[in-house]
Amino acid sequence: LGIFKYLPFVVGMVPFLPEAWVTAAKGIPLPIGISFYTFTQIAFLVDAARGEVRETHPVHYGLFVTYFPHLIAGPVLHHKEMMPQFARPETYRPHWENLAAGSAIFVIGLLKKVIVADNMAPYATPVFQLAASGGDVSSAQAWVGALAYTFQLYFDFSAYSDMAVGLSRMFGVRLPLNFDSPYKAVNIIDFWRRWHMTLSRFLRDYLYIALGGNRHGKLRRYLNLFITMLLGGLWHGANFTYIIWGAWHGMWLAIERALGLDTNPQRFNPVKWAFTFLLVVVGWVIFRAENLHVAGRMYGAMFSFGDWQLSELNSAQLTGLQVATLVVAYLSLAFFGLRDFYRNAKPAPQATPLQVNNDG
């Protein structure tokens, strides 16, 4: 994984290497699904070293590693869920119930992809292309592009996961669900309980806990959360944009843990939902941007008001100390203000308990 996915990224940052080396590294083809089957094998090897692996039949292991439906976009498979299914004889017997259920799930995923995701792309792609080309992006265009990509990504990603689950079910093999209506989340902790759930599980079990989890004090716990999400961002792609996206989510996970937010909210709160959705949308912008420059142009357009723009800070001639003071003041207000905000915000009177479902 390091050679195929990250070597070009690392080589590109070394200024003294010959251009031929850089070109050769960037020309290495990336095998389909390498990120997913690498994670499945890491989990198997770690658990084997811990003595937690019960199923070791080479044929079942081979099926587990090479099982193809999930390789494009997940879910991330775990041997404890998959290998026992390959060991059961009934898995290989055709069942019309599995074929019917699998076909229905597959069609739902296909419709999400073709009808929703693909129709969001024309509203998102041109805006990011305009920002990349150096064109003027208005605030309205930037927000439309950011929101369109937010829905495009979810419906595209969850569609592929649904199709993988459905196709696998046709074969009589059950894959874990990967999404649970993530845009219903009322905080970032809740979001990561709903978004790419199998990846969240892997990062928790094989990275966060390995770093120490919450066993060494609060500060270490927050640092472990941040590092876990930082590396989780890097897993998505070899680009600084993914790293910063991971850092963005890691920062908010740490802040929310420090604020003591409800990790399993049972009631829907529209104010908390709106704030969480805003954080998610802001994060998706840098996730989608080709580079930091494009992300900066998008953010500059999104957070411009009338004739005033973020770029006008350049003409304010602020000193480094003044900028640092503003940053510290903002973070202080954000930390202490958000703590009171979350503690005092009341659910809407008509709100009903949030129903956890599998509607994707």
Predicted regions and their residues:
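Membrane-embedded transmembrane alpha-helical bundles that form the catalytic cores
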Residues: 1-329, 333, 337-360
